Structure formats: structure tokens, C-alpha cells
């Protein structure tokens, strides 16, 4: 992956493969949707705050996840995952990576880098999954970019579950990652 910058009749190419991880509060005070503290923001303050992330920018983010504040008592318990839980997660990830290596003939390609023209070849959807995606795309007004991101994330979810085909639960879970909390 590269990015080309054109300036003063010159073109410069730079590598551009990266992973963006970002965080933000749900509102200016940080407590919108909090179970323990009340938000002190007005609806218009929340809306204006959330509009700082434009639709086109959000459209380029594969997954959004709302993370609630962790209770202090739980933080103090500090219970790490046990070895069997860690092993199960690690095995699932390794298996998903193995599926991707097989799918792409051991290349460095991953599901997230699929082009829209490659979706039919590498990301088979069951008829039910396709119907769910089409209905969701209409009701959620998904852009073309978001539509294909849902499929690519669902392909990875299916890989984690050792499924050759993307089924309805994979699409449903992937769609949940396209949602962002708005007031």
C-alpha cells in the first residue's frame, strides 16, 4: 500500500499500510451513557461533539466499539485470564490467520485488504447472510465502502469460528461494529 502526494508538479510515494486505533469520549463531559454518573451535557453539545467525526472519516474506520467504564471494585480484583482462556483465544487467532494464509496462498494479504472486486472470490456469503446484509444496507443507509467493510470483518469473524462461509451471525456481529453511539 502506498499513498501518492502531489505538490508543485512533483509526486511523492510513501508507504501507507497502518492500523489506526483511536479513542474518544461519548460527549464533552465524558459521561453520556454512563451507568453511574449522569451526563451534564445538553443534547446539542453532544451532537456537536459527535459531529467532529465526519461521516466520510467514520466510513473509513472498519470497527467502532463502545467501551463502558470499568467499576473500581472490578479494577482492584485484577483477575487476569486463566491459561486455558488465553490458550483458546490464541488458538482461535492462529487458526484464523492460517485460514487467511491458505485463502491467499501464503501471501501477506489479509481479509481487511480485500478489494471489492475480490469479495465474491474470497468471501462467500450464505444466501441468508446476503439477505441480511442487503436489508441492513438499506435500513442503515450503508455506503458502498461500509458495505464491503462489513463483509471483510464478517470474513474474519467466520475465520475465527473456523467457518468457510460467512453466515448470518457473522454479518450480524460485523454490523454491530459499524454502529456508533449517537444521542
Region roles according to the model:
Residues 1-183:
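Basic, amphipathic alpha-helical bundle interface domains used for macromolecular binding and assembly
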Amino acid at each position: 500500500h502506498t499513498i501518492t502526494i502531489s505538490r508543485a508538479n512533483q509526486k511523492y510515494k510513501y508507504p501507507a499500510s497502518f492500523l489506526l486505533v483511536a479513542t474518544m469520549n461519548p460527549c464533552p463531559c465524558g459521561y453520556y451513557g454512563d451507568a453511574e454518573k449522569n451526563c451534564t451535557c445538553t443534547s446539542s453539545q453532544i451532537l456537536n461533539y459527535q459531529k467532529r467525526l465526519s461521516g466520510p472519516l467514520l466510513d473509513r474506520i472498519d470497527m467502532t466499539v463502545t467501551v463502558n467504564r470499568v467499576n473500581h471494585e472490578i479494577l482492584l480484583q485484577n483477575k487476569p485470564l486463566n491459561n486455558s482462556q488465553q490458550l483458546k483465544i490464541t488458538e482461535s487467532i492462529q487458526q484464523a490467520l492460517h485460514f487467511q494464509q491458505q485463502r491467499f496462498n501464503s501471501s501477506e494479504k489479509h481479509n481487511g485488504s480485500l478489494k471489492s472486486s475480490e469479495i465474491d472470490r474470497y468471501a462467500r456469503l450464505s444466501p441468508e447472510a446476503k439477505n441480511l446484509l442487503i436489508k441492513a444496507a438499506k435500513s442503515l443507509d450503508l455506503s458502498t465502502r461500509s458495505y464491503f467493510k462489513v463483509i471483510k470483518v464478517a470474513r474474519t469473524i467466520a475465520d475465527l469460528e473456523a467457518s468457510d462461509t460467512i453466515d448470518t451471525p457473522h454479518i450480524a456481529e460485523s454490523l454491530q461494529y459499524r454502529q456508533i453511539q449517537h444521542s
